[in-house]
Structures are given as structure tokens and as C-alpha cells.
């Protein structure tokens, strides 16, 4: 992993994801972790997209179909379910049921989920831009 190839956003995503999944083993948040880990259901389509590039199938019908599956799964699990599950967890963290949790723990999850959700939207628009470039013909002047 390097800043040069992956970028700071990818490294932040990895660190927050890893630490968030490690720290989630508290009785209060164990059920909520599954809703967040569902974000990764879009990852196989991203990996297939990368593989098709490496196999020289960039811009092929197969890659287009995979790209549509990637976008659909991404919107569904990261932008709809992900935001909903994040809201549920943050609401629970700040409810009376979580009064015994330390403030740093609450802040870590609240801010971490905000950052991860923001990254999901940033990456979605980057994917749209990349797919537009790849699958729509360039306008001739």
C-alpha cells in the first residue's frame, strides 16, 4: 500500500475499516457491524472490472455489464443501505442505551462513519466519470 498508487483516501478507508471492524466487538455494536460490512458486496465487481482491464477486455460488452452490476450494487449497498445502517449505529451510540460507552469510542465511530460514507460518494462520482470516459464515445469537434 502506498500513497503514490492508492492515494490517501484509500489508506484512510483501509485504516478506518480495519480498526472499525476490530473495535466493533462490543455487545452494543455487534449487530450493527453486519450492516456496515455489507458495503463490501460491491467489491467483487470492482475486482472483476480490474481483471478485465488486465486481460485486455477494456471497453468490452462483458466489462460494460460488469460495470452496470458494480454501479447497481455500489448504490444499493454503500449509498442506500450503508447510509441507513450508519444512521442507525450513530443514533444508537448517542442514545441512553450507550451511556456507559466512553466519549472517544462514540466520537471515533461517528466521525469514522461520516468519513467512510463521504468516501463512498466521492468514489461513486469518480467511477461514473471513469465509466463515462470508457464507454461513451468522445465528442468530435
Language model features with spans:
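C-terminal transmembrane module of eukaryotic multi-pass membrane proteins
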Residues: 53-141
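Short hydrophobic "helix-edge" motifs at membrane interfaces and signal-peptide entry regions
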Residues: 3-4, 29-30, 67-69
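Hydrophobic alpha-helical cores of multi-pass transmembrane domains in eukaryotic membrane proteins
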Residues: 11-22, 34-48, 68-83, 111-118
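Short acidic alpha-helical/loop segments enriched in Asp/Glu that coordinate divalent cations
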Residues: 32-33, 51-55
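Membrane-helix interface segments
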Residues: 7, 28-29, 61, 103
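Short, amphipathic, aromatic/basic-enriched membrane-interface segments that mark the entry/exit
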Residues: 1-10
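Transmembrane helix interruption/hinge and helix-loop junction motifs
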Residues: 24-32
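Short hydrophobic/aromatic segments of transmembrane alpha-helices and their interfaces
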Residues: 1, 14-15, 26-27, 63-65, ...
Amino acid at each position: 500500500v502506498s500513497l503514490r498508487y492508492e492515494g490517501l483516501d484509500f489508506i484512510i478507508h483501509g485504516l478506518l475499516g480495519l480498526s472499525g471492524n476490530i473495535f466493533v466487538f462490543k455487545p452494543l455494536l455487534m449487530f450493527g457491524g453486519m450492516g456496515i460490512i455489507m458495503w463490501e458486496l460491491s467489491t467483487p465487481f470492482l475486482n472483476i472490472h480490474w481483471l478485465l482491464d488486465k486481460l485486455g477486455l477494456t471497453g468490452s460488452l462483458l466489462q460494460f455489464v460488469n460495470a452496470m452490476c458494480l454501479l447497481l450494487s455500489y448504490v444499493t449497498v454503500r449509498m442506500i443501505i450503508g447510509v441507513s445502517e450508519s444512521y442507525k449505529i450513530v443514533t444508537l451510540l448517542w442514545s441512553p442505551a450507550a451511556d456507559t460507552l466512553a466519549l472517544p469510542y462514540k466520537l471515533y465511530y461517528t466521525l469514522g462513519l461520516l468519513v467512510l460514507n463521504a468516501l463512498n460518494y466521492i468514489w461513486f462520482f469518480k467511477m461514473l466519470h471513469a465509466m463515462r470516459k470508457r464507454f461513451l464515445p468522445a465528442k468530435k469537434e
